[in-house]
Amino acid sequence: MTGINLITSAPEVNSWAEAVEQDSAPHIQEGADGIRTETAFTEVDGVRYKVVTQFKVINKRVPKVVADRKKWVKFGSCKGEPAGPQVATTYVAEEVEMQFTRNRAGEQILDVQEDKQAAKTTSREHCRHCKGNDHWSTHCPYKVMYQLDEEADANQDADSKNALGLRGDGRQMERNRSDENTCRVTNLPQEMNEDELRDVFGRIGRVIRIFIARDKITGLPKGFAFVTFESRDDAARAIAELNDIRMYHMVLKVEWTRPSN
């Protein structure tokens, strides 16, 4: 009986260089779940290291334009880089949240947010300048404007008192009557002129006089104005109907003017 010895022969190695190349060549094994394990050997500074890498190849169907875009040649800092984003050159600096409020639904959302913000303000805060309840008088953005207006009122009061002895009480009575029919408008947008203000308040009643306080140097509105009606009833209706209405990017505040005496 003749015995046959089955010997699995290894690849023929003709030189030591081929032996080193075969030994250092990566060996790839694929598991049942599609994960491939690659084992390779590398030598650094005379020290031999074993490197094991696991990866999985996934085939994904994408639109043709996306596939063509991946073939574009990279340029600039990404020149010569392989396909796909690179950590060194591709990153998101910061996320920018945008809110579009051009349609009616967006305006309603903005109004609801403003109402919630107004509800959060405490009733203890009150500004004696603009009568607002969301800040103190020291933090009023129109504090300088009101102070200038108060100084102008004080100067006018002094002039009127000095003139009483010469002109009698007729001018003073006329001025008091005018103050009774005058509304003070604050939070006035700089884009609003006298004609627009007259058009808005003229729907309530007959307007006799409109005065918009302006800066002496720049000529820009200071943010408040005075509207005088022919009757006090029209002034009262203007305060009731036009107070807290939206005008451009501001909310108008309409109230009785402070008496000058």
UniProtKB/Swiss-Prot annotation:
Describe the task this protein carries out.
RNA-binding component of the eukaryotic translation initiation factor 3 (eIF-3) complex, which is involved in protein synthesis of a specialized repertoire of mRNAs and, together with other initiation factors, stimulates binding of mRNA and methionyl-tRNAi to the 40S ribosome. The eIF-3 complex specifically targets and initiates translation of a subset of mRNAs involved in cell proliferation. This subunit can bind 18S rRNA.
Q: What is this protein called?
A: Eukaryotic translation initiation factor 3 subunit G
Keywords attached to this Swiss-Prot or TrEMBL record, sorted alphabetically, are:
Cytoplasm, Initiation factor, Protein biosynthesis, RNA-binding
GO cellular component terms, A-Z: eukaryotic 43S preinitiation complex; eukaryotic 48S preinitiation complex; eukaryotic translation initiation factor 3 complex
Q: What biological process terms from GO does the record include?
A: formation of cytoplasmic translation initiation complex
Check the record and name the PANTHER family matching this protein: EUKARYOTIC TRANSLATION INITIATION FACTOR 3 SUBUNIT G
**Subunit (UniProt):** Component of the eukaryotic translation initiation factor 3 (eIF-3) complex.
Q: Which residues cross the membrane?
A: none
Gene name per UniProt? eif-3.G.1
